[in-house]
Every structure is written in structure tokens, then in C-alpha cells.
Swiss-Prot record:
Pfam family, one: CRCB
Single GO term (MF): metal ion binding
Gene: fluC
Purpose of the protein: Fluoride-specific ion channel. Important for reducing fluoride concentration in the cell, thus reducing its toxicity.
UniProt keyword terms in alphabetical order: Cell inner membrane, Cell membrane, Ion channel, Ion transport, Membrane, Metal-binding, Sodium, Transmembrane, Transmembrane helix, Transport
Organism the protein comes from: Pseudomonas putida (strain GB-1)
Identification of the protein by name: Fluoride-specific ion channel FluC
Taxonomic path: Bacteria, Pseudomonadati, Pseudomonadota, Gammaproteobacteria, Pseudomonadales
Amino acid sequence: MIALIAAVSAGGVAGTLLRFATANWVAAHWPRHFYAGTLAVNLVGCLLIGLLYGLFLHKPLAPIELRAGLIVGFLGGLTTFSSFSLDTVRLMESGQVPLALGYTSISVVGGLLATWAGLSLTRF
């Protein structure tokens, strides 16, 4: 159990640091598009969860520490629904309602498509 907790913790730290670095990079280079960092990590996370889920379906004997460390830890730390929600509210409050609606649509539909694409990549 200690190894499982350590794997999830290490994955969470790595995912969180990558999300933090992405958000800071976007803020420094595209300050008007603050939401782009959240969109990027969420779409990449969706692609990766589909890919990993598909790979682990074909390799059910992969250690639970690896599976949980990557899916629960790393991807849990990388992706964020709360930041997506805050970004959407900020866009709406600043009067950018069409952009907020587009961002929401791209996030949800794009996330579903990315997850499907990741899973599909394991079926070849």
C-alpha cells in the first residue's frame, strides 16, 4: 500500500508541476489568453487518459502502482476542472461571452474527442 501511495503522490507532483509550468508559460507569452494553458493541459490529459486506459486494457498485468501513478496521480495533477470553470466565469464576467461559450464547447467536445483518439490509438 505504501508503494501505491508513493506512486500516486509522485505522479501527482509531476502532473501538478507540469500544469503550473504550462500556466506560467501561457501567462508570460499570451496574457490575454490565460485560459489557453488550462485548455492545453485538459486536452492533452484527455488524450493521455484514453491512450493509457487502452494500453492498460491490453496489459492488465501492469502493476497497479504504474496504472494509478499515471492515471490518478499524474493526470489527476495535470488536468483541472476547477480552473476550467474559473476561466469560463472570468471570460463571461469580462463580457467575452462568445469566447466563453466557445472555450466551454472546445473543452468538452475536444476532451471527449481527445479521449476517444487516445483510446483508438491502442486498437491498431
